Amino acid sequence: MTKFFEKRLTDVIKRPLITEKATKALDLNQYTFEVDPRAAKPDIKAAVEKMFDVKVLGISTMNPPRKSRRVGRFSGKRPQVKKAVVRLAEGNSIQLFPESEEA
């Protein structure tokens, strides 16, 4: 674990990514999260294991390129994001969608 996130592991994971590809990966016990761009794989592993009380087997990270955006004559770039695909051990799961109670 890097010293940057040593005392604040909750800042590593920003939000889960819900896309068609990420939803299909749930069947393989893989969960996709948007994480802080400065986070390393040991930081992500420690954060997921602490926050969700699960065993992580592997992590794949991606730094997709930033996209350009224009508003009128002003151009800029979207913020940098980092994606992490976390593979959990058999029998572990993360509850991303709350159970709906029928009334």
Curated annotation (Swiss-Prot):
Q: Which UniProt keywords apply?
A: Ribonucleoprotein, Ribosomal protein, RNA-binding, rRNA-binding
- GO terms, biological process: translation
Q: Which InterPro entries match?
A: Nucleotide-bd_a/b_plait_sf (IPR012677), Ribosomal_uL23-like (IPR013025), Ribosomal_uL23/eL15/eS24_sf (IPR012678), Ribosomal_uL23_CS (IPR001014)
Which SUPFAM superfamilies does UniProt cross-reference here?
Answer: Ribosomal proteins S24e, L23 and L15e
> Is Iron there in the keyword field?
no
Q: Provide a Gene Ontology MF annotation, just one.
A: rRNA binding
Gene3D superfamilies named in the record: 3.30.70.330
A cellular component annotation (GO) from this entry: ribosome
Similarity comment: Belongs to the universal ribosomal protein uL23 family.
Assembly and oligomerization: Part of the 50S ribosomal subunit. Contacts protein L29, and trigger factor when it is bound to the ribosome.
**Role description:** One of the early assembly proteins it binds 23S rRNA. One of the proteins that surrounds the polypeptide exit tunnel on the outside of the ribosome. Forms the main docking site for trigger factor binding to the ribosome.
| Name the UniProt record assigns to this protein | Large ribosomal subunit protein uL23
* Organism taxonomic ancestry: Bacteria, Bacillati, Cyanobacteriota, Cyanophyceae, Synechococcales
